[in-house]
């Protein structure tokens, strides 16, 4: 995230969703009003992230999704306020996603009773970086592992002649975001705990393993400059002047992000066979996009 104010806003948004979920259990109409307010705040949250993803992060896919999230959040709040009660499930899911993700994003290292407790993000990033290093070295490559800009041992140093190429495993490279999405969705639906746990047992290992393949692919592709192709066109497309970034843009921003969408669809297909209640959320999203009602349980033969 861009900074402290963004982190604070994120906690306010998630806190409002959690408050709405609690209120909904006691007074449905109060819960509806609180969750509607949460969706408006969620739209503001995505709005302030647009410059980060489009101008700083230079990700077309994430940038477009962030832009789309603003009206989508407002529309979800409007539908919920006007009686589409199935959106209570999606609202609870957003609350649970935030509870899973934000501690890693925002909690710093601290000292407790004389013992230093490391930042959760640092532990996760260093763990993923170490496992990525194992895969890279298993393929015969030997980049040096160094401490990155954030102070964690999460960065690979490659040399192209006399030019240093540093590729860091940041929080967005850990798979946590996708894991939080599925954890939130599964936690939010009304289903037996056994099936929920089976759904998590499917989603989490697959996402984590695929993410390790992704970080390995990107680190090698950038370190060895395997996608140094269409240099002028790619630099123009992403607004950059560094030719060494071309392999990164192609391997990460184009190939990996496109494959990530396909992977998420595949994981969703597997999970809904264990937790078909998730289809309620998918049906709501499809309704928001198309304006048509769907019965996915019947279409997928999951009744």
UniProtKB/Swiss-Prot annotation:
What are the record keywords, sorted? Cell membrane, Hydrolase, Membrane, Protease, Transmembrane, Transmembrane helix
* InterPro entries, per database record: ArtA (IPR014522), Exo/Archaeosortase_dom (IPR026392)
Membrane-spanning residues? 3-23, 36-56, 60-80, 93-113, 169-189, 200-220, 259-279
Question: Which EC numbers does the record give?
Answer: 3.4.22.-
Reply yes or no: does the keyword Hydrolase apply. yes
Query: What enzyme category does the UniProt record give?
Result: hydrolase
Lipid bilayer topology: Multi-pass membrane protein
Q: Which domain of life is it from?
A: Archaea
GO MF terms on file?
A: peptidase activity
One GO term (biological process): proteolysis
Compartments where found = Cell membrane
Q: What is its main location?
A: membrane
Q: Would I find Coiled coil among this entry's keywords?
A: no
Which chain positions carry the site (Transition state stabilizer)?
A: 253
**GO cellular component annotations of the record:** plasma membrane
Q: Which residues form the active site?
A: 173 (acyl-thioester intermediate), 214 (proton donor)
How does gene deletion manifest?
Answer: Deletion of the gene results in poor growth, especially under low-salt conditions, alterations in cell shape and in the S-layer, impaired motility and impaired conjugation.
Q: What is the effect of changing residue 214 to A?
A: Lack of processing activity
Result after altering residue 173 to A/S:
Lack of processing activity
Tell me which family the UniProt entry assigns to this protein. Answer: Belongs to the exosortase/archaeosortase family. Archaeosortase A subfamily.
Q: Which NCBIfam families match?
A: exo_archaeo, exosort_PGF_TRM
Q: Which purpose does this protein serve, as stated in its record?
A: Transpeptidase that recognizes and modifies its substrate by proteolytic cleavage of a sorting signal. Following cleavage, a covalent intermediate is formed via a thioester bond between the archaeosortase and its substrate, which is then transferred and covalently attached to the cell membrane. This sortase recognizes a tripartite structure consisting of a conserved Pro-Gly-Phe (PGF) motif, followed by a transmembrane alpha helix domain and a cluster of basic residues, usually at the C-terminus of target proteins.
Q: What is this protein called?
A: Archaeosortase A
What is the species of this protein? Haloferax volcanii (strain ATCC 29605 / DSM 3757 / JCM 8879 / NBRC 14742 / NCIMB 2012 / VKM B-1768 / DS2) (Halobacterium volcanii)
Q: Give the gene symbol.
A: artA
């Amino acid at each position: 995230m861009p900074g402290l104010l963004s982190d604070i806003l994120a906690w306010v948004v998630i806190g409002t969703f959690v408050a709405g979920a609690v209120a909904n259990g006691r007074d449905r109409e109060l819960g509806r009003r609180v969750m509607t307010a949460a969706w408006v705040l969620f739209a503001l949250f995505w709005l302030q992230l647009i410059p980060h993803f489009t101008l700083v992060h230079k990700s077309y896919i994430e940038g477009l999704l962030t832009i789309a999230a603003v009206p989508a959040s407002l529309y979800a709040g409007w539908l919920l306020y006007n009686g589409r009660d199935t959106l209570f499930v999606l609202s609870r899911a957003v609350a649970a996603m935030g509870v899973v993700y934000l501690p890693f994003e925002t909690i710093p290292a601290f000292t407790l009773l004389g013992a230093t407790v490391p930042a959760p993000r640092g532990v996760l990033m260093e763990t993923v970086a170490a496992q990525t290093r194992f895969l890279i070295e298993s393929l015969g490559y030997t980049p040096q592992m160094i401490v990155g800009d954030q102070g964690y041992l999460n960065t690979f140093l490659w040399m192209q002649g006399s030019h240093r190429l540093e590729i860091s495993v940041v929080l967005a490279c850990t798979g946590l975001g996708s894991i939080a999405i599925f954890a939130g969705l599964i936690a939010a639906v009304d289903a037996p705990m056994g099936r929920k746990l089976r759904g998590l047992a499917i989603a989490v290992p697959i996402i984590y393993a695929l993410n390790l393949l992704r970080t390995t692919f990107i680190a090698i592709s950038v370190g060895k400059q395997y996608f140094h192709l269409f240099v002028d066109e790619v630099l123009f497309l992403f607004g950059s002047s560094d030719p060494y970034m071309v392999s990164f843009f192609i391997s990460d921003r184009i190939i990996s992000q496109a494959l990530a969408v396909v992977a998420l669809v595949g994981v969703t297909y597997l999970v809904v066979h264990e937790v078909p209640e998730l289809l309620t959320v998918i049906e709501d999203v499809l309704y928001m996009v198309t304006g048509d009602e769907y019965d996915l349980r019947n279409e997928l033969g999951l009744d």
